[in-house]
Regions:
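Zinc-dependent deaminase catalytic domain
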Residues: 1-145
């Protein structure tokens, strides 16, 4: 009999599915925000709504980073704001480690736990912010089964 998914595996698998909506061909990133094991928002990286996406008009690169995109974490945070969902104490499941700006926003929004799969732009100050704010960070390896 197949082993049942843990909650972390379950929600991270959802983030990986959400990432498939990304319009970026450089990195498809997905995020799922939960409170008490209930999904309150999802997000993926892509252009500003109503404007051209990378897959339509190309990348706008600065310092090796595409500035056209809104990151998955930010889209999920903004979805919470639009729909009136408080994030205090929330967990975010994200396919890639949050960049510095996303880490600052997650800390400010009250996220207390980040579960991710892939390392990405592991900024030392992002890690320090998480430590100082008491945010638990978990890297979840892909199951071998």
């Amino acid at each position: 009999m197949k082993k049942r998914l843990s909650w972390d595996e379950y929600f991270l698998a959802q983030a990986e599915l959400v990432a498939q909506r990304s319009s970026c061909d450089r990195a498809q990133v997905g995020a799922v925000i939960t409170v008490d094991r209930s999904v309150i928002a999802t997000g993926y990286n892509g252009g500003v709504a109503g404007l051209e996406n990378c897959d339509e008009d190309g990348h706008k690169l600065e310092d090796g980073h595409c500035i056209r995109t809104v990151h998955a974490e930010m889209n999920a945070i903004l979805q919470c704001a639009r729909n009136g969902h408080a994030m205090n104490g929330a967990t975010i499941y994200v396919t890639h480690y949050p960049c510095l700006n996303c880490m600052k926003s997650l800390a400010q929004a009250g996220v207390k736990r980040i579960v991710y799969r892939n390392d990405y732009r592991m900024h030392a100050f992002a890690e320090e912010i998480a430590r100082l704010k008491g945010i638990k960070i978990v890297r979840l390896e892909r199951s071998k089964e």
